[in-house]
Amino acid sequence: MISQDKNYSDDQISQDSEIDTIEAVSETEAVSETNEIIDMRDDRIQKLEVELVQAQQRERDLLLRSKAEIENMRRRNEIEVEKVYKFSLERFVSELLPVIDNLERALEMSDKSSQNLASTIEGIELTLKSLLNVVQKFGIKVVSETHVPFNPDIHQAMTILESEEHEPNHVIIVMQKGYLLNGRLIRPAMVTVSKTKS
């Protein structure tokens, strides 16, 4: 019976040993699977953290771009409003220029030696001076200088005269004054330009 008990015990030990081995393998596999799951979750967490950082960066970039675009639009609108303000008088000034020209012509053609016309001439001079002061307050600049280089941006050459007294390509006579409104040409000055004698 002892031998049977021994065999039984050996079988029991063997089975227990197999069970322990199976349990150990199962535990190892379970730990391994758990570690794999944890590793997969860690990888997923890291991936999600990277995606989160990228999404936050995209949001910051989008916010900065939006702010910059709003600032650019605000600046463009300010510039546009300023242009509208500066040049809103352009049409009015264009209509006013012939009046100024007529007053200047009236002064040129008047007989300044006549005592009868002295007060009329003085009235025209004061009216012209007052009118020019008003238009200058609104950014109107007269282009009427002579002995300056010809500038096609503000001058319109009507004639060319040979002259030894003047430098070539210079304005020697202004036939009709030109006008600028805040730097923008309203009407070019009609001028005579010098050239060297051939």
Swiss-Prot record:
Please provide one cellular component term from the Gene Ontology annotations of this protein: cytosol
Q: CDD domains under this entry?
A: GrpE
Q: Which Gene3D superfamilies match?
A: 3.90.20.20, Head domain of nucleotide exchange factor GrpE
* Superkingdom of source: Bacteria
Q: Per the annotation, which location comes first and is thus the protein's main one?
A: cytoplasm
Give the residue spans that cross the bilayer: none
Q: Which family would the database say this protein is a member of?
A: Belongs to the GrpE family.
What this protein is reported to do is described as: Participates actively in the response to hyperosmotic and heat shock by preventing the aggregation of stress-denatured proteins, in association with DnaK and GrpE. It is the nucleotide exchange factor for DnaK and may function as a thermosensor. Unfolded proteins bind initially to DnaJ; upon interaction with the DnaJ-bound protein, DnaK hydrolyzes its bound ATP, resulting in the formation of a stable complex. GrpE releases ADP from DnaK; ATP binding to DnaK triggers the release of the substrate protein, thus completing the reaction cycle.
User: This protein is called what?
Assistant: Protein GrpE
| Lineage of origin | Bacteria, Pseudomonadati, Pseudomonadota, Gammaproteobacteria, Candidatus Palibaumannia
